[in-house]
UniProtKB/Swiss-Prot annotation:
Pfam families: RecR_C, RecR_HhH, RecR_ZnF, Toprim_4. One of its GO terms (molecular function) is DNA binding. GO terms for biological process: DNA recombination; DNA repair. InterPro entries: DNA_Rcmb_RecR, Hlx-hairpin-Hlx_DNA-bd_motif, Rcmb_RecR, Rcmb_RecR_Znf, TOPRIM_dom, TOPRIM_RecR. This is Recombination protein RecR. May play a role in DNA repair. It seems to be involved in an RecBC-independent recombinational process of DNA repair. It may act with RecF and RecO. The gene is recR. Belongs to the RecR family. NCBIfam families: recR. It comes from Pelotomaculum thermopropionicum (strain DSM 13744 / JCM 10971 / SI). Keywords: DNA damage, DNA recombination, DNA repair, Metal-binding, Zinc, Zinc-finger. A zinc finger (C4-type) spans 58-73. It comes from the Bacteria.
Amino acid sequence: MDYYAKPVARLIEQLARLPGIGPKTAQRLAFYLLNAPLEVALNLARAVEEARQAVRYCSVCGNLTDTDPCFICGDDRRRRDLLCVVERPRDVVALEKARVFKGLYHVLHGSISPVEGIGPEQLRIRELLKRLEGGTVREVILATNPTVEGETTALYLAGLIKPLGVSVTRIAHGLPVGADLEYADEMTLSKALEGRREMK
């Protein structure tokens, strides 16, 4: 990056380290921040700093929060007998946006991936099993991603949870609304068929 002043090159380099941001997008963002009013850049810097200082993981579910427990775990209107297990905090956000789930969550912070050196001990599985000890939870919904790692994690968890006498279910993976069958991959079609329900 010899074409840029050193501070500009450092800014582009740091922006490019963010997931989903390539060199060209990093350059565009850097130039935007440098050309915008100073207050725009300062507000962004303050927001990042504040989030890093104030946000932590909920001691109950592992979701991102600025209170402990998080607002979901602290909500008395939530069903305590229903627990949805997800891989990442962003999965909680996706399910909450759908406004269909009224139970509690447990965030694993990843999935089992031998290729990446991630085993069960690196995930929040011990914490999950501890939550199930109380006997309050009657059903665990495994909402891991429809990937090899997500399926492996779901199978592993089901093997641990079923002996506890807790019902274990798996979300159905199917076609998104508006999708054409011809463009769907085999795993999606297979899961869509397996998860089919009787029409009423």
